[in-house]
Amino acid sequence: MTLAGIFIGGGLGAMLRFWLGNVITAKTKGLSLPIGILTVNILGALGLGIFTGLHVANASVSLIIGTGFFGAFTTFSTFSVETIQLLMAKRVKESILYIVLTLCGSLFAFWCGWTITI
C-alpha cells in the first residue's frame, strides 16, 4: 500500500513539476536563468518544510507526501543539467547565481515553511 502511494504521489509531483515548470519558463522567456525549475525547487522546499513541521505521525502518509510527492516535484537532476548547460555556454556568472539562488533559496524556503508550523 505504501509503495503504491509513493508511486501515485511521485507521479502527481512529477506531473505538477512538468506543468508548473513549463508555465513559468514560458512566462519568463528571455531571462538569463532557468526560472521554471528554480521556482519549482524553492516552492517544493517550502512545501516540504511545512509538511515536515506538521510532524505527521502516520509513516505511510509521510512517505507518500514527503518522499513521493515532494521528492518528485523538486528536482536536483534538472538543476544539475541546467547548471552544466549554463557553464558550457560560458555563462559562468549566471551559473554561479543559479547555484546560489537554488541552494540558498531552497534552504531558506524549507526553514520558513518548517518554522511557521512549529
Swiss-Prot record:
Membrane topology summary: Multi-pass membrane protein
Regulation: Na(+) is not transported, but it plays an essential structural role and its presence is essential for fluoride channel function.
Reaction catalysed by this enzyme: fluoride(in) = fluoride(out)
Any single biological process term in GO: fluoride transmembrane transport
Role this protein plays: Fluoride-specific ion channel. Important for reducing fluoride concentration in the cell, thus reducing its toxicity.
Matches recorded under PANTHER family: FLUORIDE EXPORT PROTEIN 1-RELATED, FLUORIDE-SPECIFIC ION CHANNEL FLUC 2
Protein name: Fluoride-specific ion channel FluC 1
Natural source organism: Bacillus subtilis (strain 168)
Gene that specifies this protein: fluC1
